[in-house]
Amino acid sequence: GDGKVMAYSDALIEAFVAQVIAEKPDALILSGDLTFNGARESHEALSLRLARVRDAGIPVFVLPGNHDLNSSSAARFEGDGYTRVDGVTAGEFAALYHAFGFDGALSRDADSLSYVAALSDDLRLLMLDVNTSAAPNAVLKGTLSWARRQLMQAQADGCRVIAVSHQNLIDHSGLLSSGFTIRNADALRRLYAVSPVLCNLSGHIHLQHMGQTDSGLWDIATSSLAVSP
């Protein structure tokens, strides 16, 4: 494995929430794979913790990762055995996390859980869902068109944009690219190169790494909280 310390994940999340509340950042952005194998009870527990962050005056923005929706491996483990448990659909995800980006969105995509949110008067978030059941690890054609319209609107409004995706915009490693880089990332890279996008934030690869597209845009990949440093 990649060194995930699952036995301590609850303690890690509690410490993370406490640190976020203490440091009071302008926002908390979570780019997906939020739960333990997509289990509903894991989603519900996290939403309660994120509510504490929101109640401290810190806006929270979430996206689903590839392990968060319609999970066939959602389970509860006890001793040497396990029991299958419920996962969540895309609609249920949006309902559970409605207060963390969806309710206040400037625009929501009709074909995915993508949305645009305002961080300030001149800075927006493009939260791009690349984990639909119709196109896993890819941007849907309709979603790409929607994103193009949102970026054009941001430019017209004099706003810069931070893009966010779960999977990566570029290959961060020669060993880890297939299944990690968005399958049609080239279309996104071309779009972002002519848009007011400052950078892309991603995860998925469980590596802490920064890399640039051919146009000079940074893709900043953040490792998993449950992976040992």
Label for each model-derived stretch:
Residues 24, 59, 124-126, 134-218:
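His/acidic metal-ligating clusters that form di-metal
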Residues 45-145:
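Extended active-site neighborhood of metal-dependent phosphoesterases/phosphodiesterases
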Residues 42, 46-54, 178-189, 215-226:
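Short, electropositive alpha-helical surface patch
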